[in-house]
Design a protein with these regions (language model features):
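Intrinsically disordered, low-complexity basic tails/linkers immediately adjacent to helix-turn-helix/homeobox/MYB/SANT
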Residues: 68-92
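Key DNA-contact positions within bacterial/archaeal DNA-binding proteins
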Residues: 49
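C-terminal flanking helix
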Residues: 59-66
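Residues within the DNA-recognition helix of helix-turn-helix
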Residues: 54-57
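Short amphipathic alpha-helical boundary/capping segments
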Residues: 10-19
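Short alpha-helical "recognition helix" segments of helix-turn-helix
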Residues: 39-44
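Short amphipathic alpha helix immediately N-terminal
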Residues: 21-32
Length: 97
C-alpha cells in the first residue's frame, strides 16, 4: 500500500497540473487529505461513484502521460546517479584530506 501511495503522490506532483480543476480537487482530497469517497461526495452533492469516476480518470490520465514520457522513471534514475556522484565526491575528499 505504501508503494501505491508513493506512486500516486509522484504522479500528482509531476502531472497534477494537467488535470482539470475538479480532478485536482477530488484527487487531492482523496489521496492527500485522506477523505473517503463518501465524504467527498457528500461535500460536493454528487454520488460516491461520481467521485470515484473522476479520481479514476485522473489516475488514468496521469498514468498515460507517464507511460509515454517516463519522466518519473528518469527522475528516479537521475536521483540514483546523483547519489553515486555524491558518494564518489565524498570518497575523493577523504583521499585528499
Amino acid at each position: 500500500m505504501k508503494n501505491q501511495a508513493y506512486r500516486m503522490a509522484m504522479l500528482f506532483d509531476f502531472y497534477g497540473d494537467l488535470l482539470t480543476d475538479r480532478q485536482k480537487e477530488f484527487y487531492d482530497l482523496y489521496y492527500n487529505e485522506d477523505l473517503s469517497l463518501a465524504e467527498i461526495a457528500e461535500n460536493y452533492g454528487i454520488s460516491r461513484q461520481g467521485v470515484r469516476d473522476v479520481i479514476v480518470r485522473a489516475e488514468a490520465a496521469m498514468t498515460e502521460v507517464e507511460d509515454k514520457t517516463h519522466i518519473i522513471r528518469r527522475f528516479h534514475q537521475m536521483q540514483g546517479q546523483i547519489a553515486a556522484i555524491d558518494q564518489a565526491a565524498d570518497r575523493l575528499l577523504q583521499m585528499v584530506n
